[in-house]
């Protein structure tokens, strides 16, 4: 069976090279197109129809042809180049293998800022949030389908009740939401909210239907933290990999700031830590530090899309992040006309720069018809052989080296 290698050249382009050949068979500007081409070049055998577990899935994909012989996908960095090897190392059809543990910060298919993070840990598929709008469900599902071979999300976490974090769970009138498209086994969400919006009420209806009709388990983050009613504070999600629900003071104390109700999650691979705090604001972060013994973190999902009010000094001086991933539409005036505090904001940069310059952002505002385009694109943080690497679907350029940053932001003198 043929094997194709995807190698990034000195121009940042992605070359698809058939094993044994010296010349590239094709060259692409982004990794996703290169991978799709490589997959198409493989011999397709025993094509089958995939039995979609949810009726809503047929709206997006009536039938999916799947490879009879499994496709192995290995992404690594060798000599500064990115490689994608397609090998036969699975027995089940339609599987794109990943590293032992991978975190995917997703683009959301529109110009609006929001969060959706897909995590693959062994055989477990995890989704944290599903922003930014209902139509984002299509982009999320199309991406996750490349990795989730059985149509089941073992864990779904909704951090808080804002549209840019939950609308994709609901979907639209013609795009099925996450709860329609996938079978969700365990749903963890926020204990408190002030929300009464249409999208929140629809989220509750869809969530509860998933429990009633499909047997999902639903727990609040507080139940998880307290190990109550079958919920767990720490879940074993892979060989030596854990997912822990941290205590947030605002799980059981009311606040006027919806963001501070965010569910906070810490992953650990036995060596490295990965922190997700939703849109937790500075007050919530201070409480998080006070009530939890937080470790140094290899990866931190930037609080509240890189806003001026999150990623506070008190949190950063404890977790000392090495890699920071920002889920936002960079430079968008969606929330403000003040350039300095558009996501990712200058105050955020000033605070984070002390610890790392490995900052990545998913999307950027654009004057094109869609009003957005990829900055780094889908950001994938992978663990393989004990090494954590970052590989993005558009490019691997760190934020401070982008044209947007050079025109709109300043790197502080004491920055890395």
Regions found by a protein language model. Name each.
Residues 1-12, 44:
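Short N-terminal "domain-start" leader segments
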């Amino acid at each position: 069976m043929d094997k194709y290698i995807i190698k990034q050249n000195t121009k940042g382009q992605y070359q698809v090279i058939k094993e044994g050949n010296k010349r590239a068979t094709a060259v692409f500007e982004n990794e996703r197109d290169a991978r799709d081409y490589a997959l198409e070049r493989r011999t397709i055998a025993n094509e089958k129809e995939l039995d979609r577990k949810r009726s809503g899935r047929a709206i997006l994909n009536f039938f999916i042809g799947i490879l009879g012989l499994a496709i192995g996908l290995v992404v690594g960095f060798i000599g500064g180049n990115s490689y994608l090897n397609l090998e036969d190392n699975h027995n089940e059809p339609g599987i794109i293998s990943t590293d032992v543990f991978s975190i995917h910060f997703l683009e959301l298919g529109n110009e609006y800022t929001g969060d959706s993070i897909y995590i693959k840990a062994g055989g477990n598929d995890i989704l944290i949030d599903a922003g930014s709008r209902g139509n984002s469900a299509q982009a999320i599902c199309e991406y996750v389908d490349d990795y989730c071979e059985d149509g089941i999300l073992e864990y779904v976490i909704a951090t808080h009740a804002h549209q840019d974090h939950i609308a994709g769970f609901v979907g639209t009138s013609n795009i099925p939401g996450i709860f329609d498209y996938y079978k969700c086994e365990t749903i963890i969400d926020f204990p408190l909210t002030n929300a009464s919006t249409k999208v929140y009420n629809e989220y509750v209806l869809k969530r509860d239907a998933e429990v009633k009709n499909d047997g999902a388990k639903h727990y609040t983050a507080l139940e998880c933290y307290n190990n109550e009613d079958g919920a767990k504070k720490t879940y074993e999600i892979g060989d030596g990999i854990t997912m822990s629900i941290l205590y947030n003071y605002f799980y059981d104390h009311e606040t006027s700031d919806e963001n501070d109700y965010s569910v906070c999650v810490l992953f650990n691979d036995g060596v490295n830590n990965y922190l997700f705090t939703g849109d937790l604001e500075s007050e919530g972060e201070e409480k998080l530090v006070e009530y939890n013994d937080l470790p140094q973190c290899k990866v931190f999902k930037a609080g509240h899309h890189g806003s001026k009010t999150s990623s506070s000094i008190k949190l950063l001086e404890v977790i000392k992040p090495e890699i920071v991933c920002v889920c936002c539409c960079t430079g968008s005036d969606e929330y403000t006309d003040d350039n300095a505090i558009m996501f990712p904001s200058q105050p955020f940069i000033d605070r984070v720069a002390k610890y790392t310059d490995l900052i990545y952002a998913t999307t950027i505002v654009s004057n094109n018809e869609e009003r957005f385009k990829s900055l780094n694109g889908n950001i994938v943080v992978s663990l393989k052989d004990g090494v954590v690497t970052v590989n993005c679907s558009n490019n691997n350029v760190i934020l401070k080296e982008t044209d947007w940053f050079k025109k709109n932001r300043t790197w502080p003198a004491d920055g890395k």
